[in-house]
A protein has these predicted regions:
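Generic N-terminal amphipathic, Lys/Arg-enriched alpha-helix
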Residues: 3-37
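Divalent metal-dependent catalytic cores for phosphoryl transfer on phosphate-bearing substrates
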Residues: 28-35, 44, 53, 57-181
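C-terminal beta-signal and terminal closure region of outer-membrane beta-barrel proteins
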Residues: 183-188
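Charged phosphate-binding loop/patch that engages nucleotide di/tri-phosphates or the phosphate backbone
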Residues: 189-215
């Protein structure tokens, strides 16, 4: 089961009443959706939320949005592969390749598309950060980068060398762009090393980031 944790535990930021109400609702809804059926995923989601909040405070991103996006980022992970594909079709999400090749990337996009209808009071940047947490982008905002990185380095992740390297960058307060780059290219390297399908859009992002870093 997930460790007993709430967004209110050890928080360093003062949230207003409206924000507190929303965060309490999100946490309650997440528990209903996956605490019993997917306890590991539930614990991961809470851990990402906590890590994202800490990073947001360190990197001058919005901690409320970071918490909200962290809690919701894997909302559609409770769906089967087939259900994720069907939902992507329903929301006309098209990555330009057959769905079965990119199914692991769909859950962020489908959650962002559907949850904005459920939680209309959440800022637009929350949905973009959720949508981008699986694929990334060349023009990531600070919040986008925070969620992308937090998903990869949260404490429940095994301390493999690639994750440790990115964690150390955060601990040393490296530039957020460098932290994101580390997390992104380590992810690309993992896909290649394990001989999995590499989404062409990921290669485009990689090349754009490489060129941008050389400017």
């Amino acid at each position: 089961m997930a460790e007993a944790w709430s967004w209110k535990s050890g928080v360093k930021h003062k949230y207003n009443k409206a924000e507190r109400t929303i965060l309490e609702t999100l946490e309650r809804d997440l528990a209903k959706r996956m605490e019993k059926s997917k306890p590991g995923r539930y614990a991961h989601s809470l851990s990402v939320a906590r890590t994202a909040e800490q990073m947001a405070l360190a990197y001058d991103a919005d901690p409320f949005c970071a918490l909200a996006a962290g809690v919701l980022h894997d909302w559609d992970k409770v769906l089967t592969r087939e259900e994720q594909v069907e939902k992507a079709k329903e929301y006309r999400i098209d990555l330009g390749v057959p769905y079965d090749l990119v199914q692991p990337l769909l859950h962020g996009l489908t959650a962002a598309a559907s949850l904005r209808e459920v939680y209309p009071k959440l800022p637009t940047q929350v949905w973009q950060a959720i949508a981008r947490h699986t694929i990334g982008a060349a023009d990531m905002t600070p919040l986008d980068m925070v969620i992308f990185v937090a998903d990869g380095i949260e404490p429940r992740r095994k301390a493999v060398p690639a994750i440790v390297a990115t964690r150390q960058l955060v601990e040393n307060h490296a530039k957020l762009e460098d932290v994101y780059w580390s997390s992104f290219y380590q992810g690309v390297a993992y896909v290649i090393q394990t001989e999995r399908y590499l989404y062409p859009g990921t290669l485009d992002i990689y090349n754009e980031l490489v060129l941008a870093r050389k400017r």
